């Protein structure tokens, strides 16, 4: 990211089971970490899977017809993985896309609860828990319908609230408003696939211009390679380490209040997310196969 070489303030976030966050510039750095990604892991959502060919990674919902357009991860070389079989499940970035689109289309409300009139026949109930059909059995690669449960949505909302609260807490600690952030670097294999527009829509990350967000990929592997291949890089790592002040989130008195406020879509304070417009949004699907369901 080279954030330690510039005067402007940047964020660096590694999103996984935990969120590791650094804010700062060439003169100072502050870091913290907290649990923010459990709901995004494979196996947590009913249809959750690791990112792989044939897995849903993007969703668009037409707000007028509530028709779904599903994007899946292609095979290497760009061949559609779902050419001979339907989607197998959904990865974390696809889940963020899906919930974002459900909210924009009015199929879930501010608390993430299903709106029956908007969901129509897609919504069923089992043991008192709502399930929304995303892909019908005849179109899925498993032969079973791929569904999103109310429990899945509730888990994602807790995770996104934790992520936003971590960012808010560390920014408040150093008295830097989000609008003063010049670059927001997203690291980690999973974090690199998140659609920033969708993450903003659900209130997971700040409502900043999309060009603020920069995907870095697997920075831990790249950093380890640099350290192994160059003495100067090793010295730089030690210098950066010594610059960092660590913030303990578990002793922060305001954290739980901020967390409670963030457990809504996108937030209890809608002024924090002026670009999020319900019943619409940026309805584009990234590269991959598109399947109307």
Residues of each region from the PLM?
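A glycine-rich phosphate-binding loop feature that marks nucleotide/adenosyl-phosphate handling sites
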Residues: 15-17, 115-125, 180-190, 240-252
